[in-house]
């Protein structure tokens, strides 16, 4: 299986508000950046969308090294919380509804197609690719500001 390294980030001005997402995919010395945004969204929806779009860009099952500064995304996947939420009808252990079940459902279907490895990185720090994703996500969010 090919190994693809993926860096993702999401941004939102206001929460909710205009938002953007970005992913950088690296494979065999090549790099591809994809990005987009929405007029009214949340930061967590943009973080999820970045990962979803990155995985949708893969044409075959891969080993995916995912780097994100979103503890929401990394913890829910790495610790299995998202699968638990789905099993309980999108209810969390605190009996509150899990947010963004539409995106989580899509993401869980995508991650099941790959061998996933999750890495949390501190945002706005020394990870150059994550910083580039952040900058692009912010630019995407600005396209929707009035």
Describe each model-derived feature in a short phrase.
Residues 1-45, 49, 54-62, 134-135, ...:
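RNase H-like nuclease fold core
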Residues 11-18, 52-136, 141-143:
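RNase H catalytic domain
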């Amino acid at each position: 299986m090919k190994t693809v390294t993926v860096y993702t980030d999401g941004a939102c001005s206001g929460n909710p508000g205009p938002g953007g997402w970005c992913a950088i995919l690296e494979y065999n010395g090549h790099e591809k950046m994809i990005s987009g945004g929405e007029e009214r969204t949340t930061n967590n929806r943009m973080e999820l969308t970045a990962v979803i779009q990155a995985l949708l860009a893969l044409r075959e099952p891969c080993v995916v090294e995912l780097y994100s500064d979103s503890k929401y995304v990394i913890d829910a996947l790495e610790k299995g919380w998202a699968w638990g939420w789905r099993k309980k009808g999108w209810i969390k252990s605190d009996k509150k509804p899990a947010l963004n079940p539409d995106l989580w459902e899509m993401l869980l279907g995508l991650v099941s197609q790959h061998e996933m490895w999750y890495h949390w990185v501190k945002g706005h720090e020394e990870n150059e690719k994550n910083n580039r994703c952040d900058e692009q996500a912010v630019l995407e969010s600005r396209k929707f500001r009035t």
